[in-house]
Amino acid sequence: MSENFQHKTVLLDEAVAGLNLRSDGIYIDGTFGRGGHSRLILSQLGAEGRLIAIDRDPQAIAAAAQIDDPRFSIIHGPFSALADYVQEMGLSSRIDGILLDLGVSSPQLDDPERGFSFMRDGPLDMRMDPSRGLSAAQWLMQAEEDDIAWVLKTFGEERFAKRIARAIVERNRTEPLSRTRELAALISDASPFKEKHKHPATRSFQAIRIYINSELDEIERALEGALVALAPQGRLSVISFHSLEDRLVKRFIRQYSRGPQVPKGLPLTEAQLQAQGGPQLKALGKRMPGEREVVDNPRARSSVLRVAERIAR
């Protein structure tokens, strides 16, 4: 049985403020976690307001069951299916705001039974939803050396990806890796250079977790789904925690904030330009955590909040 691990919500007030809440609006918390953002949103909604939360983690669903509020509902599933959920509910283009708090939550990191962290020993799992897909141990056991190296390099920007991948494959031939501390020790031994103030396994654990959970694909699909869901002037508020996530969010907002990409000098009338489709989002800027929040919650250090608004078409 896992302990009741606490979660400090990062950029709580800023992310919710980015939604520009209306008391009677319909909102989505795409990453319920332990409900920090959801509870703040509910506290600012009126009797006619509505909040729909989403999470694929069974422990998050259990936490959501503790919220006894007729304005609140929870969907057990990936946020990548956001467009499907709103279409099934007849809410396409009717959502007034969507909040996404990306990455792994503190309770997931701190619970050794989930296998996300090497700080405490646990089974080498790393799945957001333990009932679906391969665990990290299962994938590492069957993956080719080149595939492991590609994952470590692509999703962890690990400079010693090939050396670490070779060590993993060689170890699995004799004694399969099954524990987080085993993998962390192996990575440390395989790394010829140690970064100051950073465990050698940090990048590899991030990379494997992202791959196991298809995190970047999930984010991309969720962002595309937001365009289907949001009403005109609806807000998108997204918190990311590492450069790969933030780069993806930044690129998405920039892409949909541009008008039609027409070659210079092409003779088109105003009506023809309109037919090409105008921008769909307006970027409203980004926020970083303040010094006090970083001191209170060191995990907030790398977080970035980006906010955008849906443009009527």
From Swiss-Prot:
Record protein name field: Ribosomal RNA small subunit methyltransferase H
UniProt: S-adenosyl-L-methionine binding residues: 35-37, 55, 79, 101, 108
The keyword rRNA processing belongs to this UniProt entry's keyword annotation: yes
Substrates-to-products reaction catalysed: cytidine(1402) in 16S rRNA + S-adenosyl-L-methionine = N(4)-methylcytidine(1402) in 16S rRNA + S-adenosyl-L-homocysteine + H(+)
Physiological role: Specifically methylates the N4 position of cytidine in position 1402 (C1402) of 16S rRNA.
Protein family: Belongs to the methyltransferase superfamily. RsmH family.
Annotated Pfam families: Methyltransf_5
Transmembrane segments: none
Underlying gene: rsmH
A biological-process GO annotation: rRNA base methylation
Organism: Edwardsiella ictaluri (strain 93-146)
One Gene Ontology MF term: rRNA (cytosine-N4-)-methyltransferase activity
Principal place of residence: cytoplasm
Keyword entries, A-Z: Cytoplasm, Methyltransferase, rRNA processing, S-adenosyl-L-methionine, Transferase
Compartments where found: Cytoplasm
One cellular-component annotation, GO: cytoplasm
Superkingdom in the source lineage: Bacteria
